[in-house]
Amino acid sequence: MDTITAVRNRILQLCGEREISINKLATISALPPSSIKNILYGKSQNPKLITIKMICDGLNITLGEFFNTQEFDNLEHEIK
């Protein structure tokens, strides 16, 4: 799995666990909905760390908690 897919999956997982929409996530993260949708729908292939941090802040989790999944542990190498 590549990094952007893991990020997308994690955002969707966290929203599902909290039963919140993408628009609600945008509101609580102080981001425009388009920023999150661009990540989820593949328009943004390299989301900024600050954007992910803002999502984490909105969800009241740390960056460590965001990235602490098997998907991130098993990422394929980006440099080939």
What are these regions (language model features)?
Residues 25-26:
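Short alpha-helical "recognition helix" segments of helix-turn-helix
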Residues 57-68:
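Intrinsically disordered, low-complexity basic tails/linkers immediately adjacent to helix-turn-helix/homeobox/MYB/SANT
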Residues 1-20:
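A short, Lys/Arg-rich alpha-helix, primarily the initiator
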